[in-house]
């Protein structure tokens, strides 16, 4: 056995028999579930970390990726790579597809490209690892050797894949110099993963769904062409289902270890299987799963549906004459039925995002709330007070600090501050206690924290989140409209509805934003939101108006839905954007919503007391 460290990349097998890596973020999520052990239920819901993967669940025991809406199953595996290779450095190589978006290369190809890039080669020929492409680093382009078609490529930095250290068989270690790995291929076994791999390969090689170029890649020659439009992907497979090492020009940085059970330390990443998946693969995979595996998948999917707020409505056999009584509807029913669990058939409810049309004469102002709109402009800089003067209002000096750590710099309070950034004007050994919550810090650290924030005259305790002063945000300029419409929300039949319309245009980021001077986008505006016109609903509206004036409703950042950066996003105060249903979790009925949003506003320092200090 050899003590070694490696980065772990989780991968899934696509319909062409190529292993595709999950992204680093997804891999880290899988590892967290694995480390949680049996209490996590043995399944990983990928949509929790990447909304684009919402249909997918991984069953860790059978090592399969399950697509909920189609029932397609794909094998997954845990692969090891040299920490000095691309995944160990957070480097991702991507090619531009016909739609203008970027697609990551398969892990082996990306490692090969990065190795040549680090050696400062002007270009690299990928023919030796089975792809008829040249990567030209001077132009950052990919050239098809046969058609001479060129595509752009790029190198970007992402999270580093998870690192593991432990004992590994010597035959699974990587060689110290470039060249093919020396371990012999493992013989095929009868575990579900290997059966699935072999079934996919058999379908592709023997007249399956893959194009001719892909089937050629599966031959023993190991040299083939990558089909267009997909860019260079994983290395060729031989007929035993084992991935072949790269040729002489590529670094052999792979630890060829394929595990059927997922130990701790894995990471997840790129998009899951394409929608045009090989259905035969899914059927073969389903047949290999035993009752316990099916039960786990069914229960995992039920958890996802319940968490998303999808209601269940019993449905009968619609035509009454079918011999199936009733027909199985939905993959959850198929799974639960196959696992011997009771099945209740449901009809999916209709998504209702907007109310029925409302005429101008039907729109009314809200009693007790003046005006029907509110605008915000750019931040007005506060003058005349230094950070030290601001903090002086909230702090009491501590002459004899306790033998504890400052939770900002993690140095002892009895020692000088460990902050190493721009030097505040206070002494690094001064210690202060926040007046209301009583938490103690180096004053030096608090000044540095204030300078790194919004510098609006307020301070938030980093331990308990108590807010001192009036907290403001970085919301870009926009308009908030609010009025009554003559329709009721589900769960609130006795009152009308307050409609809020937010409008924010795209623009240029200011000094308080993540990238000053850079443009930002504003997707999905105007955004329509809904509250019941009840006493508590009007209370929430008044507090939302305070939050709007303090620029706390929106911020500029990275969208958790699309992954787009430098765009307008919600800022921790949830809104209901679904009028007549609750399929997305952002609609009605929701008995706890008004209380929850009041708590979220209070966490931003906005409560009923705030309304007495702000305009209506």
Swiss-Prot record:
Protein EC: 2.3.2.27
Main location: cytoplasm
Record's function text: Functions as a ubiquitin ligase protein in vivo, mediating 'Lys48'-linked polyubiquitination and promoting degradation of TBK1, targeting to TBK1 requires interaction with NLRP4. Regulator of Notch signaling, a signaling pathway involved in cell-cell communications that regulates a broad spectrum of cell-fate determinations.
GO cellular component annotations of the record: centrosome; cytoplasm
Subunit structure and binding partners: Interacts with NLRP4.
Zinc finger (RING-type): 406-465
Catalysed reactions, as listed in the record: S-ubiquitinyl-[E2 ubiquitin-conjugating enzyme]-L-cysteine + [acceptor protein]-L-lysine = [E2 ubiquitin-conjugating enzyme]-L-cysteine + N(6)-ubiquitinyl-[acceptor protein]-L-lysine
The name this protein goes by in its record: E3 ubiquitin-protein ligase DTX4
GO MF terms, alphabetically ordered: ubiquitin protein ligase activity; zinc ion binding
Tissue: Expressed in brain, testis, embryonic fibroblasts and thymocytes.
Keywords: Cytoplasm, Metal-binding, Notch signaling pathway, Repeat, Transferase, Ubl conjugation pathway, Zinc, Zinc-finger
Keyword Protease belongs to the record: no
Native organism: Mus musculus (Mouse)
Record region (Disordered): 223-254, 355-387
CDD domains per record: Deltex_C, RING-H2_DTX1_4
WWE domain span: 1-78, 79-155
Pfam families: DTC, WWE, zf-C3HC4
Comment text on domains: The WWE domains are thought to mediate some protein-protein interaction, and are frequently found in ubiquitin ligases.
Biological process terms in GO annotation: negative regulation of innate immune response; Notch signaling pathway; proteasome-mediated ubiquitin-dependent protein catabolic process; protein K48-linked ubiquitination
PANTHER family: DELTEX-RELATED
Similarity section: Belongs to the Deltex family.
Signal recorded as keyword: no
InterPro entries: Deltex_C, Deltex_C_sf, Deltex_fam, WWE-dom_subgr, WWE_dom, WWE_dom_sf, Znf_C3HC4_RING-type, Znf_RING
Chain segments annotated as coiled-coil in the UniProt record: none
Annotated compartments: Cytoplasm
Residue ranges, compositional bias (Basic residues): 375-384
């Amino acid at each position: 056995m050899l003590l070694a460290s490696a980065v772990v990349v989780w991968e899934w097998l696509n319909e062409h028999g190529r292993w595709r890596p999950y992204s680093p973020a997804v891999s880290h999520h899988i590892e967290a579930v694995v480390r949680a052990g049996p209490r996590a239920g043995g399944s990983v819901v990928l949509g929790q970390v990447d909304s684009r993967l919402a249909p997918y669940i991984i069953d860790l025991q059978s090592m399969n990726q399950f697509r909920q809406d189609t029932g397609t199953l794909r094998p997954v595996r845990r692969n090891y790579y040299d920490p000095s290779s691309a995944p160990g450095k957070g480097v991702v190589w991507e090619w531009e597809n016909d739609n203008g978006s970027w697609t990551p290369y398969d892990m082996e190809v990306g490692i090969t490209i990065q190795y040549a890039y680090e050696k400062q080669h002007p270009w690299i020929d990928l023919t030796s690892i089975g792809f008829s492409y040249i990567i030209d680093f001077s132009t950052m382009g990919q050239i098809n050797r046969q058609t001479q078609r060129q595509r752009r490529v790029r190198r970007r930095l992402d999270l580093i894949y998870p690192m593991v250290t432990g004992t590994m068989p010597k035959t699974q270690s990587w060689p110290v110099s470039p060249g093919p790995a020396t371990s012999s291929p493992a013989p095929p076994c009868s575990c579900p993963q290997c059966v699935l791999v072999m079934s996919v390969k058999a379908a592709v090689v023997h007249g399956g769904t893959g194009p001719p170029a892909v089937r050629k890649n599966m031959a023993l020659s190991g040299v083939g062409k990558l089909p267009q439009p997909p860019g260079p992907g994983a290395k060729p497979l031989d007929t035993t289902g084992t991935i072949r090492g790269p040729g002489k020009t590529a670094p052999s940085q792979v630890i060829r270890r394929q595990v059927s059970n997922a130990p701790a330390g894995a990471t997840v990443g790129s998009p899951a299987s394409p929608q045009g998946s090989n259905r035969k693969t899914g059927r073969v995979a389903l047949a290999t799963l035993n009752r316990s595996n099916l039960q786990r998948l069914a229960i995992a999917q039920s958890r996802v549906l319940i968490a998303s707020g999808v209601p269940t409505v019993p449905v009968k056999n619609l035509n009454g004459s079918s011999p199936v009584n009733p027909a199985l509807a939905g993959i959850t029913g198929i799974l639960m039925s196959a696992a011997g669990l009771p099945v209740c058939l449901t009809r999916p409810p209709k998504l209702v995002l907007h109310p029925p049309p409302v005429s101008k004469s039907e729109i009314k102002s809200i009693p007790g709330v003046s005006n029907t709109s509110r605008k915000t402009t750019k931040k007005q800089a506060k003058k005349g007070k230094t950070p030290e003067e601001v903090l002086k209002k909230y702090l009491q000096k501590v002459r004899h600090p306790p033998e504890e750590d400052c939770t900002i710099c993690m140095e002892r309070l009895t020692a000088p501050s460990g902050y190493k950034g721009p030097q505040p004007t206070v002494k690094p050994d001064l210690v202060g206690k926040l007046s209301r919550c009583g938490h103690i810090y180096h004053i030096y650290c608090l000044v540095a924290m204030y300078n790194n924030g919004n510098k609006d005259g307020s301070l938030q305790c980093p331990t308990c989140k108590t807010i001192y002063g009036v907290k403001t945000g970085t919301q870009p300029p926009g308009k908030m409209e609010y009025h009554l419409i003559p329709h009721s929300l589900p769960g609130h039949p006795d009152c009308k509805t307050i409609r809020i319309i937010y409008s924010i245009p795209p623009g240029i980021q200011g000094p308080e934003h993540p990238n000053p001077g850079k443009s930002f986008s504003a997707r999905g505006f105007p955004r329509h939101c809904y509250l019941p016109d009840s006493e508590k609903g009007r209370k929430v509206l008044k507090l939302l108006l305070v939050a709007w004036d303090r620029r706390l409703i929106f911020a500029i950042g990275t969208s958790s839905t699309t992954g787009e950066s430098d765009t307008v996003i919600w800022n921790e105060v949830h809104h209901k954007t679904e009028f007549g249903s609750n399929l997305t979790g952002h609609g009605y009925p929701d008995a706890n919503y008004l209380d929850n949003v009041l708590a979220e506003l209070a966490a931003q320092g906005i409560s009923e007391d705030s309304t007495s200090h702000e305009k209506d």
